[in-house]
């Protein structure tokens, strides 16, 4: 009985010890979570944090609207104001030509920023992600029958988006620097998802209200917001350069 009591006592002590370790581990995880969220909002002066959040939420707002409607525009019938592409034509335009343009734009954007830094290429990238949206104004106005013209227009828009999106991704990395960088980058990507979701909620309603042509005109006008939020972000001139990153 004595041996059994001691054995039960040892088991109880181990259970209490294990529970204490688990509780301590949970407290440590919770503490780090709170600190990572707190430092995410306080890692810069309040004004710069606000500007950073506005940049992350609104830099891609026009693209958030365009992305939801452009695909529908390509396949919708001419009687509804669309280009009336067949499924095969649409697959080639978006799945081949568009992807090639997007990939090439992203590669060249990364090469440019790696050579000269994000700050130097910010404005060219802002122009690249906004001005090519004009091709959809042209397409919805001219309604071209030429499949080649449609492909060229989609390529231009996707290439510009790939090039301009580089600035956005690099800024997320820039803001995430410092302690808890992995957690901060995860929070930045949450804002990135929100930046596309919010415009998408109203894109369809707006298109039905004004039609394709005026919808794309509104998208181009809203590109002013992208220029505004980009004008106020503060970026280290050395950030993004390959040599600077290697030293880090």
Question: Across the structure, where does each feature detected by a protein language model lie?
Answer:
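Single conserved hydrophobic/aromatic residue that forms the stacking wall/gate
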Residues: 1-12
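Juxtamembrane intracellular "pre-TM" segments in multi-pass secondary transporters
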Residues: 18-51
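Helix-to-loop junctions at the C-terminal end of transmembrane segments
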Residues: 104-119, 207-208
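Loop-to-transmembrane helix entry/capping segments in MFS-fold secondary transporters
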Residues: 87-88, 178-188
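A membrane-interface helix-boundary motif in multi-pass transporters
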Residues: 5-6, 205-223
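Multi-pass alpha-helical transporter architecture, strongest
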Residues: 13-16, 217-247
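C-terminal transmembrane helical hairpin of 12-TM major facilitator-type secondary transporters
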Residues: 120-168
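Short amphipathic helix-loop junctions that connect adjacent transmembrane helices
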Residues: 59, 68-90
């Amino acid at each position: 009985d004595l041996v059994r009591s001691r054995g039960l006592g040892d088991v109880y002590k181990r259970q209490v010890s294990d529970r204490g370790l688990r509780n301590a581990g949970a407290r440590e995880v919770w503490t780090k979570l709170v600190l990572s969220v707190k430092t995410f909002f306080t890692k810069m002066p309040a004004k710069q944090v606000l500007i950073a959040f506005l940049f992350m939420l609104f830099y891609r707002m026009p693209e958030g609207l365009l992305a939801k409607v452009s695909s529908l525009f390509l396949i919708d019938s001419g009687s509804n104001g669309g280009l009336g592409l067949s499924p095969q034509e649409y697959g080639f335009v978006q799945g081949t030509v568009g992807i090639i343009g997007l990939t090439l734009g992203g590669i060249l954007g990364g090469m440019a920023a790696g050579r000269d830094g994000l700050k130097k290429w910010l404005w060219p990238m802002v122009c690249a992600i906004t001005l090519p949206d004009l091709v959809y104004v042209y397409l919805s106005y001219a309604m071209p029958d030429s499949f080649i013209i449609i492909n060229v227009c989609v390529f231009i828009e996707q290439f510009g988006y790939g090039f301009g999106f580089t600035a956005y991704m690099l800024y997320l990395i820039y803001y995430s620097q410092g302690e808890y960088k992995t957690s901060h980058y995860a929070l930045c990507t949450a804002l990135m998802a929100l930046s596309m979701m919010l415009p998408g909620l109203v894109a369809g309603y707006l298109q039905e209200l004004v039609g394709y042509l005026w919808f794309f005109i509104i998208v181009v006008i809203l590109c002013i917001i992208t220029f505004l939020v980009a004008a106020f972000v503060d970026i280290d001139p050395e950030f993004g350069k390959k040599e600077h990153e290697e030293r880090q």
